[in-house]
Swiss-Prot record:
A GO MF term: vinculin binding
Listed name of the protein: Alpha-actinin-1
Pfam families membership: CH (PF00307), EF-hand_6 (PF13405), EFhand_Ca_insen (PF08726), Spectrin (PF00435)
Coiled coil: none
Superkingdom assignment: Eukaryota
Taxonomic lineage from the root: Eukaryota, Metazoa, Chordata, Craniata, Vertebrata
Provenance organism: Gallus gallus (Chicken)
One BP annotation, GO: actin cytoskeleton organization
Residues annotated for Ca(2+) binding in this entry: 760, 762, 764, 766, 771
Primary localization class, coarse: cytoplasm
Length: 893
């Protein structure tokens, strides 16, 4: 019967394109690779049965070795083979083998026993590949993948850590040999030095991998390196077969290793437990022995007599706590940890619990450790108490020495200081300083009383505590007490001497102070009097000189009392001299409170007496001069009080004449000129006032209470009066010119003046913008409050106030009103005239201007007219329109 291999029914460990029914022959290179690989693979299993094949298509023809191969790789017994040599026997044996393969779930397609018996290479290789797939590859599964994919995934994972290895398939990914080397190195790194391999040397890499696999891994050499390198795409089946051998080789080794590891693990656990038991016993013994040796040392309470010895014991105890005990604490802790760990491991490994030898249980060790800590606590308390006791003695002794040394240092030189006689030659301030210093010393002495008492108390306590050096302490304490009593007596004696001297010097000091208090103001009074008597006074009025004279008389009246004060001050000085002579006081001879001597007082007093008559004479002379100045003031004031109002009156009359509208302009002009003549005739009075003013200046008179008018005011008023009358006459003359030039009637002029005066409410002769606007409206001008009205008013203001002064004069008002009411020339009229001269053209030529106008006016126009640029322009054409508007200020000329 024929068996066919179905590639779709083999758990996807064959790709669909690998169809053995195709008629095409195998690639010769692939066939060669498959022959070698499959032959080597078969021999790797047949050698277990003591045989092998040489020619794959010949040696399987009788079916005997084929059945043997299946028994070896499956581990099962097949049906008994036929031993005959006939074709039918061979076909029967091959069918038995094929039936066994089919019984394993492999559907064979197009593979029949006859082709195998006939030595068909293609069918024989296909059959072997089917066997390899079923028994070498099908059972490979990684993360639920198919056989081929599982084998590929296994290769990828094993080679992932290696550089230059990227396994993606079972053909070209293996050509450089690094994939085979990586698999070997991953499982047996000692067999290959992977770091020395080169990607560009595939032959060496492949031969290295094949040789090592054959020699050390018992994997036969199934491929030739030259065939793989020389083939563009190595045969996939050959590569898969070879790689599966690596998989099974390493898988088997891993199982053996796992078994060995399991045994080693069990033994290691047992050995570790035994070691832990031994360690526990030894550690427990050592720790208990250390506790046994340490407790007697801690229970030793023999006291020491010196602080140094006790401190050494304390240092030894600190070393014990710092150096010796911590390791033992760690050992005790480790002992308990080891015991618990050991019991846990024994329990987890189903071993019996560990029972330490007698007396070495954890509880026994804890009890011993508790005894150690109890002894340690008592020892530490005893040490500290002993140290405190010795420390107290040392502290008291040191405290006594320190206080005694401080006291002795303080008393050094104090007795000699208290016996000094420095107060006999001291001044009062020095005596007071000595008393203050002595009081400070007494305070210091009182403060040291506590220290002396403390020294005695410490000495007493040292005696009570049987201090070894008590005799020297007592001797030193007695010396300090004796010296203290002597200091007290000397202190009292010095205080009494200082107080006696102070009382005597205070009497003298009080006299000195009284002298200084009275001499200083008297001296100041004399100095002030001398300054006043010699002062060069400057007065401007008779009242001022009278005030100075009165003050001087009052000063002279105080001179008798001043002389009495002088004599009293000199009496104080004489009393001091008497005391010094009587009690033989050692004085410096100078008053500490003042530098003013009696001689100085007498000298200044004599000088004051000499200055008084000189002052009398100076005041009399100044009084006469001020009387003359007063006469000049009255004379100037009388004239100024007449001229000033006269100028003001004339100014008001001129303003009224310019505003009022009596008669014609010619009448007003005549009136003003007569007025001007009367003003000019007043000039001699102004000149006379100037003369009086000159006399006042020469007399240095700067103010005049008899008038509010100064010469400067008169001059300014006079000049303003002359200017105003001249300006007013000029305005009237201009109004006459305007009236005659514009043809304004007298009635119109009067109307304009009436309107202007009505809105000139402050009589300043000018109108502000708002006043001017109201005036225009009253005259019939339509100026609205909208934008157009504002623009029109702005245009009018630019005419009447071209300099933007913010006011409109009556002359500007008349000019504007005359322009608005009279028939005057305009720019349009001039343009119309030029157009007539130009023959109704928009431009005019030079020849036409020279023909129609006088020569000078023609040249004037030619020089100022701009060229005409219109479309109808001819050469030399001039623009008379822009020229006409420029004449009236409506554009730039």
């Amino acid at each position: 019967m024929d068996h066919h291999y179905d590639p779709q029914q083999t758990n996807d460990y064959m790709q669909p394109e690998e169809d053995w029914d195709r008629d095409l022959l195998l690639d010769p290179a692939w066939e060669k690779q498959q022959r070698k690989t499959f032959t080597a693979w078969c021999n790797s299993h047949l050698r277990k049965a003591g045989t092998q094949i040489e020619n794959i298509e010949e040696d399987f023809r009788d079916g005997l070795k084929l059945m043997l191969l299946l028994e070896v790789i499956s581990g099962e017994r097949l049906a008994k083979p036929e031993r005959g040599k006939m074709r039918v026997h061979k076909i029967s044996n091959v069918n038995k083998a094929l039936d066994f393969i089919a019984s394993k779930g492999v559907k064979l397609v197009s593979i029949g026993a006859e082709e195998i018996v006939d030595g068909n290479v293609k069918m024989t290789l296909g059959m072997i590949w089917t066997i390899i797939l079923r028994f070498a590859i099908q059972d490979i599964s990684v993360e639920e993948t198919s056989a081929k994919e599982g084998l590929l995934l296994w290769c990828q994972r094993k080679t992932a850590p290696y550089k230059n290895v990227n396994i993606q398939n079972f053909h070209i990914s293996w050509k450089d040999g690094l994939g085979f080397c990586a698999l070997i190195h991953r499982h047996r790194p000692e067999l290959i030095d992977y770091g020395k391999l080169r990607k560009d040397d595939p032959l060496t890499n492949l031969n290295t991998a094949f040789d090592v696999a054959e020699k050390y891994l018992d994997i036969p050499k199934m491929l030739d390196a030259e065939d793989i390198v020389g083939t563009a795409r190595p045969d996939e089946k050959a590569i898969m077969t070879y790689v599966s051998s690596f998989y099974h080789a390493f898988s088997g080794a891993q199982k053996a290793e796992t078994a060995a590891n399991r045994i080693c693990k069990v033994l290691a656990v047992n050995q570790e437990n035994e070691q832990l038991m031994e360690d526990y016993e030894k550690l427990a013994s050592d720790l208990l022995e250390w506790i046994r040796r340490t407790i007697p040392w801690l229970e030793n309470r023999a006291p020491e007599n010196t602080m140094q010895a006790m401190q050494q014991k304390l240092e030894d105890f600190r070393d014990y706590r710092r150096l010796h005990k911590p390791p033992k604490v760690q050992e005790k802790c480790q002992l308990e940890i080891n015991f618990n760990t050991l019991q846990t491991k024994l329990r987890l490994s189903n071993r019996p619990a560990f029972m330490p030898s007698e007396g070495k249980m954890v509880s026994d060790i804890n009890n011993a450790w508790g005894g150690l800590e109890q002894a340690e606590k008592g020892y530490e308390e005893w040490l500290l108490n002993e140290i405190r006791r010795l420390e107290r003695l040392d502290h008291l002794a040191e405290k006594f020495r320190q206080k005694a040394s401080i006291h002795e240092s303080w008393t050094d030189g104090k007795e000699a200081m208290l016996q000094q006689k420095d107060y006999e030659t001291a001044t009062l301030s020095e005596i007071k300083a000595l008393l203050k210093k002595h009081e400070a010393f007494e305070s210091d002495l009182a403060a040291h009383q506590d220290r002396v008492e403390q020294i005695a108390a410490i000495a007493q306590e040292l005696n009570e505590l049987d201090y070894y050096d008590s005799p020297s302490v007592n001797a030193r304490c007695q010396k300090i007490c004796d010296q203290w009593d002597n200091l007290g007596a000397l202190t009292q004696k010095r205080r009494e001497a200082l107080e006696r001297t102070e009382k005597l010097l205070e009497t003298i000091d009080q006299l000195y102070l009284e002298y200084a208090k009275r001499a200083a103001p008297f001296n100041n009074w004399m100095e002030g009097a001398m300054e006043d008597l010699q002062d060069t006074f400057i007065v401007h009025t008779i009242e001022e000189i009278q005030g100075l004279t009165t003050a001087h008389e009052q000063f002279k009246a105080t001179l008798p009392d001043a002389d009495k004060e002088r004599q009293a001050i000199l009496g104080i000085h004489n009393e001091v001299s008497k005391i010094v002579q009587t009690y033989h006081v050692n004085m410096a001879g100078t008053n500490p409170y003042t530098t003013i001597t009696p001689q100085e007082i007498n000298g200044k007093w004599e000088h004051v007496r000499q200055l008084v008559p000189r002052r009398d004479q100076a005041l009399m002379e100044e009084h006469a001069r001020q009387q003359q100045n007063e006469r000049l003031r009255k004379q100037f004031g009388a004239q100024a009080n007449v001229i000033g109002p006269w100028i003001q009156t004339k100014m008001e009359e001129i303003g009224r004449i310019s505003i009022e509208m009596h008669g014609t302009l010619e009448d007003q002009l005549n009136h003003l000129r007569q007025y001007e003549k009367s003003i000019v005739n007043y000039k001699p009075k102004i000149d006379q006032l100037e003369g009086d003013h000159q006399q006042i200046q020469e007399a240095l008179i700067f103010d005049n209470k008899h008038t509010n008018y100064t010469m400067e005011h008169i001059r300014v008023g006079w000049e303003q009066l002359l200017t105003t009358i001249a300006r007013t006459i000029n305005e009237v003359e201009n109004q006459i010119l305007t009236r005659d030039a514009k043809g304004i009637s007298q009635e119109q002029m009067n109307e304009f003046r009436a309107s202007f005066n009505h809105f000139d409410r402050d009589h300043s002769g000018t109108l502000g913008p708002e006043e001017f606007k109201a005036c225009l409206i009253s005259l019939g001008y339509d100026i609205g409050n909208d934008a157009q009205g504002e623009a029109e008013f702005a245009r009018i203001m630019s005419i009447v106030d071209p300099n933007r002064m913010g006011v409109v004069t009556f002359q500007a008002f008349i000019d504007f009103m005359s322009r608005e009411t009279a028939d005057t020339d305009t720019a349009d009229q001039v343009m119309a005239s030029f157009k007539i001269l130009a023959g109704d053209k928009n431009y005019i030529t030079v020849d036409e201007l020279r023909r129609e106008l006088p020569p000078d006016q023609a040249e004037y126009c030619i020089a100022r007219m701009a060229p005409y640029n219109g479309r109808d322009a001819v050469p030399g054409a001039l623009d008379y329109m822009s020229f006409s508007t420029a004449l009236y200020g409506e554009s730039d000329l």
